[in-house]
Amino acid sequence: MKKAVILLSGGMDSAVVTAIAQSQGFMVHALSIRYGQRHTSELDAAVRIARALNVVAHKVVDVDLRSIGGSALTDDIEIPDAGGEGIPVTYVPARNTIMLSLALGWAEVIGAADIFCGVNAVDYSGYPDCRPQFITAFETLANLATKVGVEGTQLHVHAPLQFLSKAEIVHEGLLHGVDFGLTVSCYRADVDGRACGRCDACKLRAAGFADAGVVDPTRYMELPCSLLLL
């Protein structure tokens, strides 16, 4: 069987991507990054998901992006309830570039030619490293910057959720047997994984379940507007 490295954050998108990769016959090696995020319960979720999906291997790698700063997800910066114009304060500088680079390194070591990530360009919050152009550019980089790429192995970066709405992602996850109750998406999630219900991530998640007509298993401390209107 072919091997693949999947970036597994602990959120719903990466859980669905992990299940998709397995359904395509890949031996899944899941990679989670402890980068200094304040919502550390998502890493606990990543461990739960990896166990539930019975992945071949799961690594949690430490990268201290908090020492660099520049994001409300790592710094003591207020996380807004509503998104504003431009790139939001929850953007972590170069995060996806760094994470994909780590995934690329592990892929080269284990002999995997495929990397999967859960970036989404439809319901994304304005992050530049969630755009299709970024994924295409990184795949080009991967083939230029690695020993295996130079020697002729074609490396692929897959973003199967790239053009799906959150509702479509919910349906895709259910189709592949994902237990969304194991996942954590909230930027302010507490140590037990309970979601705030107010941040942009919570709103997108709740709206996705509502639009899909599926019960949201998330434990919210405060119900998002999309659920209050049901």
UniProtKB/Swiss-Prot annotation:
Its EC number is 6.3.4.20. It catalyses: 7-carboxy-7-deazaguanine + NH4(+) + ATP = 7-cyano-7-deazaguanine + ADP + phosphate + H2O + H(+). Catalyzes the ATP-dependent conversion of 7-carboxy-7-deazaguanine (CDG) to 7-cyano-7-deazaguanine (preQ(0)). It is an enzyme of class 6 (ligase). It comes from Xylella fastidiosa (strain M12). This is 7-cyano-7-deazaguanine synthase. It holds the Pfam family QueC. Its cofactor is Zn(2+). Zn(2+) binds at residues 186, 196, 199, 202.
